[in-house]
Every structure is written in C-alpha cells, then in structure tokens.
C-alpha cells in the first residue's frame, strides 16, 4: 500500500480545525520526521524570485565548475558504485549569528537582497513551527527557541544545491543517506524534478514536489530534546538522468554553545520513563557529526553519552 506523505495546510490552524492540524503535525513528527507545509505565509512571488535567481546563478557561476569537477574525478565514466561522493553542486549562506553573504563574490546584489528577504521569512516560519511543536509536546511557548539560543542566538544558514542530470544515477547518489545533525530544516525544493526520498518503515518514500510548498524535517537535536518522542529520519537524494533539480535547505540550529538535553517535562513524572539521550554542547556534537554524517545516528548519541560521563567526572555542563 502506498503511503501518503503528510501535507499540512497552515491556513487550517486558524479556527475549528486547529486541533486536527496539530494532531496531523504530531503524527508526522512521531512517525515520519518530515512533513510538507502549504499556505505557510511566505509569498509565492518571493519564492518564484528565489527559484529564478538560483537557477540563473547556477547556470552563470556553478555549472561549468561542476562539469570540471566531474571530469577531474572521472565521475561521468564510472563503472562501479561510488560511495564517497555526491552528485551535487552547492554553496552555503550563513544568516545567523553573522551573515557571510558579503563574502561570497559571485552573488549579485539582487540575488543577495532576495535571499536575505527569503531567509527572514524562513526564520519566522521556523520559530512558528517550533512553537507548534511546543504546543503538541506540552512545553511552554518559546521553550525550543530558548534551548537553541545559547549565548549568541541560533545558527541559521542555507545550503543552496543543484543536482544536474547524471549519466549513471544507479551508481552515484545525488546526496547519500543521512539524518540532519541540527534542529529544524526548511526545504524549498524543485516542483518539477523529484529525487528526495525519506526512509519510512524500512522503505524509501518519495517526497512529492509541490509548487510553493516548504518541506520540514526534524534534526537530531529535536530527537534528543523530545527524548525520542520525535525522530530525525534518514533521507537521501537520488540523481536523475533528466532534469536539473534545485534544492534550497535552510537549517535553524542551536547556537554553538547551546546545551542540548531532554526536556525535563518530557522525562519527569512518567513512571519507568528514563532519560534516553545525553546532555551535551551542540558544537561538540557537530564536531563528531562531520566525520560520521553518512552513518547511523545511534553511535553518535552513544559517543555523546560517553563524553557526558567523562564530563560528569570533571564537573557539570552549565545550562544556559
């Protein structure tokens, strides 16, 4: 039986349908780790500009560079499966705590302006979604934003990716399977070329391309904070022989020095319920993740538990 990917209409949060929509979001967080938002409040005109300028920037500044990389690595003539490279062309924009847009020389002023406007809208949407999760979890409004804050506010950035046509998609992934390390991810994906797959009950399920939607997925930090009630989920991008797929993924993550641990309200007061996840500084987790991104998340959590035990012997981690 084909599973329907969860699609949430945010217009229905206003009025009598609110409880039903919150239940849909809760079910998606518990059973999928992903859901797709429509009527999310970001203007279609702005999204169309972002898409147009992103595709123009790829053609002008990134396409030739990607072809040269493919040629230098011989990726267009591989005969066996490649497991250490992704078929993607990317660059990264940092928005918070400090923007790096002025440092990226090949972005024209119009593109910078539009991406700044888009990032501002996504930041607001991320915080709105986090508060919906708080409401479902029985946490006070603003709890997740506060935990993410650290001393300088959250980390927020955007990975802009293009997945060009691939001559041998059966031998190389657009992006290998992984869970995301951070907090809340907001994806504006191509509405014509598919390729994003989510692992659901042991099967890969396609995330349907929808015009003007934003796909939400949960990172490892939300799994920790919810003590496993919500899950980060493995996902991948399949390379395609036809079509150039655009993907703009924005990551609303904890600040580097934010201390991450299961919310006490989700652990205390429940008989036989124990704290399943460790307490750690987000930056320490990221340092570990860099080398283990394309592996299962459980060994990362175990490594952080071991680090927590060592820290307990040396003294407690301060909670901001």
UniProtKB/Swiss-Prot annotation:
Found, by tissue, as follows: Flowers.
The domain of life is: Eukaryota
Question: Single GO molecular-function term?
Answer: L-ascorbic acid binding
Annotated pathway? Alkene biosynthesis; ethylene biosynthesis via S-adenosyl-L-methionine; ethylene from S-adenosyl-L-methionine: step 2/2
Obligatory cofactor(s): Fe cation
Where along the chain is Fe cation bound? 178, 180, 235
Enzyme Commission number(s) of this protein: 1.14.17.4
Q: State the family named in the UniProt similarity comment for this chain.
A: Belongs to the iron/ascorbate-dependent oxidoreductase family.
Name-wise, this protein is 1-aminocyclopropane-1-carboxylate oxidase 3
Task: Give the originating organism.
Answer: Cucumis melo
